[in-house]
Structure formats: structure tokens, C-alpha cells
Amino acid sequence: MCSSDLIRFDQAFSNETGLSLFESSQLALARWSVDNQLVERGDWSNDWDDWVNLIFSMRVQPKLGAKRPVLVTHFPASQAALAKLAADDERTAERYELFYHGVELANGYHELLNPSELANRAQIANRQRIEDGKFPLPIENPLFQAMKIGFPDCCGCALGFDRVVMLACQATSLREVIPFPADRA
């Protein structure tokens, strides 16, 4: 039987960077990224989450699950997507991802049930979309309507089967295991 490790997002981040995630400003993350040669200039983005994602994907993720699978929990609340905020730390969300050999194999979360919170998150996302030159998305979508009626408490997990196959076959890219990659479709 294979066991796995469990680590909070902020702890994994700190272990690899020495930075305290929730005490680091966008400017501090930008400086760290320049100093560690992830980007050439600190004006790559004005968004805290962009810097967190860059550092996580380039420095933290490649080292996750080196010996055995690891579940990364308590993602920043700003990256909650459709997850509930954690009752024990509202800076974080009840969201997790499973990594093995630096590859994300699965992700899941405890589903948000509050339609007001969903609308608030959609408004925040739409402001960012408009800033990025994209069209805003409708706030009162089918999920919002379902929450208003009464959505049952639930959670879910999505497994990237293609990624599991890639690791099992010791392939170096998904292209090697997907029968119809986009460029051959």
C-alpha cells in the first residue's frame, strides 16, 4: 500500500522559498522571483496570485512528491475557485491537490454553497477579466441558481488519468500518452 504525505500550501511554499506566504507582499514576491531568476523584471505582474503561482509552479511544485505522493492542502483563499474557505484559517480554502514526482495528478475541494459568496467571487474575477481586456462572465449562472435553490453539501476530486498514465509509462510529456494531441487532432 502506498502512503502519502500531507502539507499545507503555505508550508510547502515556505519550505522551498523561505518566504512566509501570507506575510509576503506582491513586491516581496516579485523581488524574490527576480533574485532567483524566475523573471528578468519585477513588473511582470501587479497581481499577488500571479507571483504566488509563478513561484509555486517553478520552485515548489517540481519538488513535490519526490519520494511518495503528497497532498497539498489549504490553498490561499484568493485561489479558492469554488471551494469553501477553511473554518480553521479563512486565509485558506478547503482545496487540495495531489502531486507525485512534481506532477499534479488530482485536485479537489469542499464545494462552496453560499450564493452570495459565489457572486462576490464572480465580481472580483470579472474586475480582473476587464483589467485583462476580457469580457466579464455572467454572475447569475446555473450554478448560482442551484445554490439559491439549495445545493447539498458536497465535495469532489478530479483525477488526471492521462498524467497517471504518463508517470506509469515513465513518459516525459503528456503528448507521449495522449492518442490525439491537439496538434494531431
Regions found by a protein language model. Name each.
Residues 7-185:
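A translation/RNA-centric and nucleic-acid-associated enzymatic feature enriched
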Residues 1-3:
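Short, small-residue-biased leader/transition segments that mark boundaries at the very start
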